[in-house]
Amino acid sequence: MPRNRCGFAVLMLLLLSAPADADRLDVLEGKFAFNWHAEPSREKCIKVTGPLLADFKSTKYRCDLNAKSNTSSGASARMCTEAKGRKEYLIFDTLRACDDERKTQASNE
């Protein structure tokens, strides 16, 4: 019986922590992103809202909310990677930072 209680407690902990992780991703709302695994010259920076934000919150993506400054332009960015690995979004605080990075990467194609 104690083993069942322990398993139940672990299950409840996992279920309760999932919404908290999704809520953490709300910091991405209103930021700007592009998929750098595609051709940057064909991509556009898009605002992280609605369906894209919902995708980031789902199990389709894994997001690293720690800002990294190892981008081509030197701007700080967060990343959300598709579980399948085909897409990886660089997420910037401003449209200008997003466009600068996209253009820098496009010039290196």
Report each predicted region and the residues it spans.
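Hydrophobic helical h-region of N-terminal Sec-dependent signal peptides
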Residues: 8-14
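N-terminal signal peptide c-region/cleavage motif recognized by signal peptidases
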Residues: 17-19
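Bacterial N-terminal signal peptides that target proteins for export
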Residues: 1-8
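Post-signal/leader-peptide non-cytosolic segments of secretory proteins
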Residues: 23-109
